[in-house]
């Protein structure tokens, strides 16, 4: 997994390789006095490529870190769970862990301090009530009382199941973190003319007016590019 740091204008200003950590569907970025700490899935299952644990690692530009490195702590808050992906609510100091148990997708929410101390007593343990049959999970975010969940696929051709003329099947669902109830679901209609247009990543940019940010992947001849759209959360 390669983590790339981008400037607001889209220029690459740093990168780090994480080997054996996982797929990287969602992750957290925690500012610290010494720089930036990354919350990522870790201990990838060799059969699937998805993480079986959560790690918190410092970002070090230009370096390579192995999941099996000595001294790296792998948090395993949910024994038996698979495909674990973390993200952070920096405002309220909470950790959200997306995970699967059997065929069921779920979320667990922890206080950051408790999680780091390996006190894995969740504030909330929530079955995903928003994910519909056949949908592809593409990321999640936690802010205040809501989980924001991104789903969707890249465009197919016009004869396929997700043609550009239909506007794509990208959706954001809002889940109440206390009750687990899905309280809203909206199709993302931004940039319908993008080539490929696969939804890949969602986050909340905190501030006096928080913004919900959604990334759409664009396939070009030599690489993929990313376009990010924001709206009021």
Describe the residue ranges of each PLM region.
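Beta-propeller blade signature
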Residues: 1-8, 50-62, 106-115, 162-180, ...
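Blade-loop segments of beta-propeller domains
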Residues: 4-42
């Amino acid at each position: 997994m390669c983590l790339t740091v981008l400037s607001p204008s889209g220029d690459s200003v740093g990168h780090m390789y994480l080997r054996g950590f996982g797929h990287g569907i969602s992750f957290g970025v925690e500012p610290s006095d010494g720089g930036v700490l990354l919350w990522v899935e870790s201990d990838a299952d060799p059969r699937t490529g998805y993480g079986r644990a959560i790690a918190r690692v410092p970002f070090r530009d230009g370096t390579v870190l192995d999941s099996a490195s000595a001294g790296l702590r792998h948090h395993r808050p949910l024994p038996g769970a698979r495909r674990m992906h973390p993200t952070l609510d920096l405002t309220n100091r909470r950790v959200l862990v997306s995970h699967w148990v059997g065929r069921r997708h779920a979320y667990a929410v922890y206080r950051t301090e408790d999680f780091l101390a390996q006190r894995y007593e969740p504030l909330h343990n929530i079955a995903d009530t928003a994910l519909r049959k056949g949908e592809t999970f593409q990321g999640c975010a936690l802010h205040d009382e809501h989980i924001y969940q991104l789903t969707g696929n890249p465009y197919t051709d016009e004869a396929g199941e997700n043609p550009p003329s239909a506007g794509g099947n990208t959706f954001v669902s809002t889940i109440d973190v206390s009750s687990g109830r899905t309280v809203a679901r909206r199709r993302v209609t931004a940039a319908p003319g993008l080539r490929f247009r696969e939804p890949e990543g969602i986050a909340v940019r905190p501030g006096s007016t928080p913004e919900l940010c959604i990334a759409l992947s664009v396939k070009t001849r030599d690489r993929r590019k990313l376009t990010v759209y924001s709206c009021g959360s």
